[in-house]
Amino acid sequence: MPYYNRKEYPKQIWVSEIPEREVSLLRENLAGIKQTTFVLIKKEEAFHQLSEKRSRDIIFLSSNQSLLDLARDVDVPAIAYQKPEMDTFLHADMVVEGFEEVDMTFLQRVYERHFNIPWTILETKRCIVRELELSDLDALFSMYAEPGMTDYMEGLYEYEEELEYQKAYIENMYRFYGYGMWLVFEKKTGTLIGRAGVEHREELNGDMELGYAIRTSFQHQGYAYEVCQAIMQYAGEELQVHLLHCLIQKENALSEKLAIKLGFSYCGDREIDGVLMSDYQIEW
């Protein structure tokens, strides 16, 4: 069974060559966090410690490119602080110009991305929504093999081709955009029960589409509504997206019913790849 909710945290946050004002702001954002230790470290000591210590427990923050390069060389996730007066652009796992929004969730996601750990996007009462990782493929194929799963959507490629497709998707969608189609797991059992998420569509002039599919054996239990509501809230709050489409095949009455229940309205038809689709939209 896949790891449906695997979270990992850095145990230590090392900070070097960061202005005191920004350090104070970072400390304030991390107040009350118990699972991680905050370590303020001088440049010379940082060079020594990073050279000596190859550890998966650390995330490193600095404005010094030589230190950031050393962190990269010893496989330590790093965040660069780009000072306003700097002429050259720093390089690291992430570059920030301030620490106003750098909290534990931000640090955790930089850490997880560095070590190729799938992000947990959100939780609902009964479900976990997280990014796909390659070890999920067997469970994904099992889900798609259930009767009725591909009645109104495309199936998967052959296994090796799907593997290559998902490798590219992880690299080009998750890493670049930070969103896409995610996996839905039932908390109680850890079972993969669906896919849902948001993607840009060329056919929609770059607008975002909400997509969803629930495993046949888990349909008619309210999972799609529960998960899609949470994703719509996430899209608004985290992605600043306030217009979504649902493209639904004409014969898919259940999906149309769900879209209407979620607040979408029918706005016309679109032919996509030779298939007539109903375009439902919501704006908030």
Which functions belong to the PLM regions below?
Residues 2-9, 28, 32-38, 47-58, ...:
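Acyl-donor (CoA/ACP) binding surface of acyl/acetyltransferases
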Residues 6-20:
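Short hydrophobic beta-strand segments
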Residues 23, 162, 228:
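Aromatic/hydrophobic pocket-lining residues that form the small-molecule binding cavity
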Residues 148-169, 179:
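Conserved GNAT-fold acetyl-CoA-binding loop/helix
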Residues 45-47, 162-163:
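Short alpha-helical segment
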Residues 14, 59-62:
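Structural motif
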Residues 169-183, 194:
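A short helix-loop-beta-strand connector motif used in the catalytic cores of GNAT acetyltransferases and
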